[in-house]
């Protein structure tokens, strides 16, 4: 399994708007693409100094599945224009990790 991790940042004022956009449009759109090997996405949020940090963690069966999502240059970020207008800054590249151990205790959350 592959984990794709990406960071984006908003002002405090835009944080709720961005989270709503992710939940109601962007994540739904990703799911509706029916990407073979796509397993899901998590959203993390925290306040850091003068901004709000968001981290997305996506789960895929393989790098081929990641490439189906992000394209040949799969390390490049995938940030829709609507999100770019809300974000104050974001990582241009995503990080990819091979998942070596998975603890399913999170299923009880």
Sequence positions of predicted segments:
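Short, well-ordered beta-strand segments in beta-rich or mixed alpha/beta enzyme
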Residues: 3-9, 42-74
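Short, surface-exposed ligand-recognition loops at beta-strand->loop->(often short) alpha-helix junctions
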Residues: 9-22
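Short acidic, gly/pro-rich beta-turn/loop elements at beta-sheet edges
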Residues: 16-18, 51, 66-68, 104-106
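An amphipathic, aromatic/His-enriched active-site/gating alpha helix that lines ligand/cofactor pockets
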Residues: 24-37, 59-96
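Glycine-rich beta-strand-turn "strand-cap" elements at beta-sheet edges
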Residues: 39-52, 78-109
């Amino acid at each position: 399994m592959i984990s794709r991790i990406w960071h984006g940042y908003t002002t405090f004022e835009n944080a709720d708007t961005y989270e709503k956009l992710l939940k109601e449009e962007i994540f739904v759109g990703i799911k509706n693409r029916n990407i073979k090997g796509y397993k899901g996405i998590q959203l993390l949020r925290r306040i850091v100094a003068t901004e709000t940090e968001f981290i997305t963690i996506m789960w895929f069966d393989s790098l081929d599945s990641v490439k189906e999502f992000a394209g040949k240059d799969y390390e490049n970020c995938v940030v829709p224009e609507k999100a770019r207008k809300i974000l104050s800054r974001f990582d241009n590249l995503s990080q990819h990790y091979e998942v070596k151990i998975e603890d399913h205790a999170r299923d009880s959350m």
